[in-house]
Design a protein with these regions (language model features):
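Hydrophobic "anchor" residues on beta-strands that sit immediately upstream
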Residues: 112-114, 171, 305
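A general structural motif
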Residues: 108-110, 147, 169, 232, ...
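Short coil/turn segments at secondary-structure boundaries
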Residues: 126-128, 164-166, 185-186, 249-252, ...
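C-terminal cap/substrate-recognition subdomain and adjoining C-terminal extension
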Residues: 1-12, 97, 191, 199-233, ...
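Active-site phosphate-binding/coordination module
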Residues: 132-231
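Hydrophobic "anchor" residues
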Residues: 120-121
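Non-catalytic pre-domain segments flanking phosphatase-related domains
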Residues: 1-117, 126-128, 136, 292, ...
Length: 367
C-alpha cells in the first residue's frame, strides 16, 4: 500500500477526525463532491442504459439475480453433485476443523478481528429491526475485544448496529464502512491516545440519501412486505417479507427512483437492495483504514480475520487475499463463489470459533 500522511485533529467531543493524503486508497478528494477524483464516474446515459427501466428483460435478469442470492426454499439453491460439494469444502474448509492450522499461521502476529453483523453475529430474521444478538454472543464478542482489536463492519447504520451490540470497546464501521468510529474513550487498550476515530468519506451525500430514502418509502409502500431502511450513508430496501411474485414490481419501483440519481448506485445483498454513493469505498477499504488507524497499515506482523456472510463482505475477503495477510471466513450453509479461505455454517459456529480463539489467547497471553 502507498505511504500515507495522516493529519489528526481533536474536537471538543473527544472524537478524532483523520484526513489522509498521498495514498492510493485515501485521497484528498474523498471528501469532495461526486465529480472529484476518487468517485466512480457514471454518465447519466450509461446509468439509464444499465438500469433500462422500461426494458423487461433487464428487470427479469435482476429478479433472477435476486432469487439466486436470496433463495426462499432449499429447492431454490443450485443443486451440486457430491464431488462439487466436496471440492468446495476442500477449498473452503470449516474454520473449526482447521483451527489449529489457523493458529499456527497467526503465530507471532497480532490478530485483528473484523465481524459482519447480520447473519454472522445474529441470525437472519424477517424483521431487520429485530435482528438481536444473543446474550451469549455478546459476552463472547466482549471477550474477543479484550484479547484482540475488534471491529463490527456492517451495511447497517452505525448507530443501529451499536444499539444491537452495545459494546463500547469495539470499532464500528456502519454503512458498508462509510461511517467509522472507534471505541468510547477509555475502553480500548489498543489506541494509545484513548480517543475515537471518526471517518466519513461520503458525508457530501447525506442530503441526497435522505431525499432518496423518502422517495423510496413513498414508491414502495404499495408493495406488501417491503421495508426501506435509512442507514445514513446508504439506503436498504428489504424484500425478505415480499412475496416472490412481487419482486419484479419492487425492482421496477426502486429503479424508477434511481434513474433520477446518477450519483448513486444500486447493489444487491441477501434479500436486500442497497443504494450507495458512487465512491470507491467498500468493506475492504474500511478494513484497510482500520488497520491503518491501529498502526498496522504497513506491518508484516498483523493477522486480520474477517468473518461475514454477504456479497458485500467479499470486498473484505478479496482485500485480505490481495494483502497476503490473514484470511476471510464465509458464513454460509451452502457452497457459493467466494474469496474467503474458510467457512462456517451459521452464527452458532461463529460463536464457537470466537470462543476457541479466546480460550487459546488466555492460555497463551504472550503470543
Amino acid at each position: 500500500m502507498a505511504t500515507q500522511n495522516v493529519v489528526v485533529s481533536e474536537s471538543k467531543s473527544g472524537i478524532i477526525a483523520m484526513a489522509v493524503s498521498n495514498s492510493a486508497v485515501f485521497t484528498p478528494s474523498a471528501q469532495k463532491p461526486p465529480t472529484a477524483p476518487g468517485y466512480i464516474s457514471i454518465s447519466r446515459k450509461k446509468l439509464l442504459k444499465n438500469l433500462d427501466i422500461n426494458g423487461g428483460h433487464r428487470i427479469n435478469a435482476w429478479v433472477d439475480s435476486m432469487r439466486a442470492s436470496s433463495p426462499t426454499h432449499l429447492k431454490s439453491v443450485p443443486s451440486l453433485s457430491a464431488d462439487e460439494r466436496n471440492s468446495w469444502i476442500m477449498q473452503h474448509p470449516s474454520a473449526l476443523d482447521m483451527f489449529e492450522q489457523i493458529i499456527e499461521a497467526s503465530r507471532g502476529k497480532q490478530i485483528v478481528m473484523f465481524l459482519d453483523y447480520d447473519g454472522t453475529l445474529s441470525p437472519i430474521v424477517e424483521d431487520p429491526d429485530r435482528a438481536f444478538m444473543s446474550s451469549k454472543m455478546r459476552r463472547t464478542v466482549r471477550k474477543v475485544a479484550k484479547c484482540f482489536p475488534t471491529a463490527i463492519v456492517s451495511g447497517r447504520c452505525r448507530d443501529k448496529v451499536y444499539s444491537f451490540v452495545k459494546l463500547a470497546e469495539l470499532y464500528y464501521a456502519g454503512s458498508h464502512g462509510m461511517d467509522i468510529k472507534g471505541p468510547t474513550k477509555g475502553f480500548s487498550k489498543y489506541k494509545k491516545d484513548k480517543q475515537s476515530v471518526l471517518f466519513q468519506p461520503a458525508s457530501e451525500f447525506l442530503p441526497l440519501i435522505d431525499e432518496v430514502y423518502k422517495q423510496l418509502v413513498e414508491n414502495t409502500k404499495s408493495v406488501p412486505g417491503a421495508k426501506v431502511e435509512n442507514n445514513r450513508f446508504c439506503v436498504s430496501v428489504h424484500f425478505r417479507c415480499v412475496d416472490e411474485q412481487k419482486w419484479s414490481e419492487l425492482a421496477q419501483r426502486v429503479r424508477s427512483v434511481l434513474k433520477e440519481y446518477p450519483q448513486l448506485r444500486l447493489t444487491q445483498g441477501r434479500k436486500v437492495l442497497e443504494i450507495r454513493p458512487t465512491i470507491k469505498w467498500d468493506k475492504g477499504k474500511a478494513l484497510e483504514f482500520l488497520l491503518e488507524s491501529l498502526g498496522f497499515g504497513n506491518c508484516n506482523n498483523v493477522f486480520p480475520v474477517y468473518i461475514g456472510d454477504d456479497r458485500t463482505d467479499e470486498d473484505a475477503f478479496k482485500m485480505l487475499r490481495e494483502r497476503g495477510q490473514g484470511f476471510g471466513i464465509l458464513v454460509s450453509k451452502f457452497p457459493k463463489d467466494t474469496n474467503a479461505s474458510y467457512s462456517l455454517q451459521e452464527p452458532a459456529e461463529v460463536m464457537d470459533f470466537l470462543r476457541r480463539l479466546v480460550d487459546w489467547k488466555q492460555m497463551h497471553p504472550r503470543m
